[in-house]
Amino acid sequence: MPHTHKITPQEALQRTIEHREIFHDEMLHIMRLIMSGEMSPVMMAALITGLRVKKETIGEITAAAQVMREFSTKVHVADKTHLVDIVGTGGDGSHTFNISTCSMFVAAAAGAKVSKHGGRSVSSKSGSADVMEALGININLMPEAIAKCIEEAGVGFMFAPNHHPAMKNVAPIRKELGVRTIFNILGPLTNPASAPNILMGVFHPDLVGIQIRALQRLGAEHALVVYGKDGMDEVSLGAATIVGELKNGEITEYEIHPEDFSMTMASNRALRVETPEQSKAMLLGVLDNQPGAARDIVILNAGAALYAANVASSMQEGIVKARAALESGAAKARLAQLVSITQTLAA
């Protein structure tokens, strides 16, 4: 339906109170007010809380993600074949080591190009940026330098605050509210390198269907959105994993189980860490191909990423390739390469 006037923040708030949707064009306008700093902090806090209580729709999420992409500092990767993001919404409260960060080195060693988009810890003891720094990777590179990392090492890390400067208007409000808001689910939808393929972990089963449909509307090519039934925002080793898959424009939803891939089930308790240093130690153990639950869950997730990146024709084949990349030492070599390149480019 056409709208003759631009919706005001007050009208948008009233919609959320009445549990009515904010339409696409309206949400674009509201989100631009937020990102440009034109909305007052009080109004912003009320509106993002109202959206959360109402439950954000796929349309609202898609429009908000489009605006976040508009305002972002992009990384231009010339060849997007096999380019994939491995990302989680975070906030799953499982306090595990950085599984997606470790998986990216394995996926890169097996032929994917990984443009990893992440930040500091949300609710975990160690966010992807925290462990990257502990590993000696410089996370504050210019976009051209990150593109070079992706082209040369097959992997690059985009530190979210550097690519979403407009988020500074929202950051203090998110921090003070202390609850999940639409921004927790927007981060993974706004990859600055526009990776066409994605493996995304989410913190709630309802988000599987929502995020895969948002990705479809945002033009993703091959995407897997996963939720481990033990609460993990990863492909889980401790329970079945709900998967939403977008491929060739079609969405399918199904469940996978560790035993489908001849994996021994293990509780995620074995994967818990307290600090970025502990996460780093566990990650290095995996890259040294040390047997155990940590290695198995990385193989599962790297396998899923290789399937999403179209390097493997199935998750099963992805797992075989991921295991080989660890056994050969190629995954560990990718980490050394990224450390070296980021230090050189930062100099």
UniProtKB/Swiss-Prot annotation:
One of its GO terms (cellular component) is cytosol. It is an enzyme of class 2 (transferase). It catalyses: N-(5-phospho-beta-D-ribosyl)anthranilate + diphosphate = 5-phospho-alpha-D-ribose 1-diphosphate + anthranilate. Binds 2 magnesium ions per monomer. Pathway: Amino-acid biosynthesis; L-tryptophan biosynthesis; L-tryptophan from chorismate: step 2/5. GO terms for biological process: L-tryptophan biosynthetic process. 5-phospho-alpha-D-ribose 1-diphosphate binds at residues 88, 91-92, 96, 98-101, 116-124, 128. Anthranilate 1 binds at residue 88. Its EC number is 2.4.2.18. Keywords: Amino-acid biosynthesis, Aromatic amino acid biosynthesis, Glycosyltransferase, Magnesium, Metal-binding, Transferase, Tryptophan biosynthesis. Anthranilate 2 binds at residue 174. Mg(2+) 2 binds at residues 233-234. Its cofactor is Mg(2+). Homodimer. Catalyzes the transfer of the phosphoribosyl group of 5-phosphorylribose-1-pyrophosphate (PRPP) to anthranilate to yield N-(5'-phosphoribosyl)-anthranilate (PRA). Belongs to the anthranilate phosphoribosyltransferase family. HAMAP family: TrpD. This is Anthranilate phosphoribosyltransferase. It comes from Polaromonas sp. (strain JS666 / ATCC BAA-500). The lineage of its organism: Bacteria, Pseudomonadati, Pseudomonadota, Betaproteobacteria, Burkholderiales. The gene is trpD.
